[in-house]
Regions:
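N-terminal small-domain helix-loop-helix segment of the aminotransferase-like
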Residues: 2-106
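Conserved core of the PLP fold type I
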Residues: 67-208, 212, 218-220
Length: 221
């Protein structure tokens, strides 16, 4: 008999940003005269820039011609795109990596969940607090987060980011297998220095841990 993954039933509710959207819409209905400044999900607010529009038109024209039409792309992404990423995002910062280390995906949210497929379910995890909810939810859905009680998961190590510590988390006081870091941080906006990040790398090396680093907002710095 096919059985449902019981860990889905442990999730406390729907996706956080969906709940926020419902509350915002309800407020707009009851307060139509008020202007709402959304600080929820980071949706776009401006139209596409000319360079992006030009590239999309060019790609569409290529797909419309038998001579230049192409089907599925390579499983890791097109070489020209991976090489451009290395050139502009890594070599420009003095970082040398091999093209085999670059994968083209469909966003951080998808791969945050996809990483779970290659890591054991009983690895321990550490997250900054507050944190982007997908990091925890994706682990909860495979049973790695434990039991949800009083707003906390029993098997998750929470690393407080408060005004008292300038929103900079301390290293865990015990071994953690998987560490989620996002800097510039969502939602605090904090940026860690190279020296502060080095502490995390050293911790990971000393404890045979993995750092899952989300650099979604690196362009801000």
């Amino acid at each position: 008999m096919a059985l449902i993954n019981e860990h889905f039933l442990k999730l406390p509710g729907s996706y956080l940003f969906a709940d926020i959207a419902k509350k915002v819409n309800a407020y707009k209905v009851s307060h139509p005269q008020q202007r709402v400044i959304s600080l929820g999900i980071g949706d776009v607010t401006q139209p596409l820039c000319p360079a992006v529009i030009e590239a999309m038109h060019k790609a569409t024209d290529e797909m419309a011609s038998k001579a230049s039409f192409r089907g599925y792309g390579p499983e890791r992404g097109y070489d020209f795109l991976r090489e451009a990423i290395i050139k502009h995002d890594y070599l420009s910062r003095g970082v040398h990596i091999d093209p085999s280390e670059v994968f083209i995906n469909d966003g951080a949210k998808s791969d945050t969940g996809n990483f779970q497929e290659i890591l054991r379910w009983d690895n321990s995890i550490g997250v900054t607090d507050p944190v982007y909810p997908v990091y925890i939810d994706s682990n909860a859905m495979i049973g790695r987060a434990g039991v949800y009680e009083a707003g906390r998961w029993s098997s998750v190590t929470y690393l407080p980011c408060t005004a008292e510590n300038n929103f900079i988390p301390s290293l865990p006081n015990h071994r953690v297998d998987m560490i989620y870091l996002c800097y510039p941080n969502n939602p605090t906006g904090t940026v860690l220095t190279k020296e502060e990040l080095t502490k995390w790398v050293n911790y990971a090396l000393e404890n045979d841990a993995i750092i899952l680093y989300d650099a979604a907002y690196q362009a801000y710095i």
